[in-house]
Amino acid sequence: YKNKEKFSADNLTVYEGDAAETVAKLPEPDKVFIGGSGKEMSQILETIAAFPKKIKVVISAVTIETIAETNELLGKYAPDFDVIQATVGRGRKIGSYHIMDTNNPVMIFTAYI
């Protein structure tokens, strides 16, 4: 709720609860963002796939395990998925030079399921 208020996102509805259970109770969405799904991604995607129309799904993944799981599951539900890697770096001075230190790249998967 804090980010919704902070960014005045009046067109955003927040649903609280366990994602795998909550998604099944929602009205059919246009788009779904999945991040930090833990061990429930398979169940979440299965629920989304049961909706009658195709839904745009965006999944963020940081760990190797989540990247592998997402790749496998999207291969099943949407073989033509897209993936990009986003990395942010912060400049740091070393002597008279500056280098970019990067942290945890994020893989962003997009698919219609």
Model regions: which residues?
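Short, surface-exposed connector motifs at secondary-structure boundaries
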Residues: 8, 25-30, 47-56
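S-adenosyl-L-methionine
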Residues: 1-29
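C-terminal substrate-binding/active-site "lid" region of AdoMet-derived donor-dependent transferases
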Residues: 45-105
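Charged/polar positions on well-ordered alpha helices
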Residues: 1-2, 50, 113
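Structural motif
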Residues: 12-13, 30-32, 56-57, 81-82
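Short, well-ordered alpha-helical microsegments
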Residues: 23, 41-42, 67-68
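A short SAM/SAH-binding and catalytic strip from SAM-dependent methyltransferases
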Residues: 20, 30-42, 60-61
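C-terminal edge-of-domain segments
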Residues: 106-112
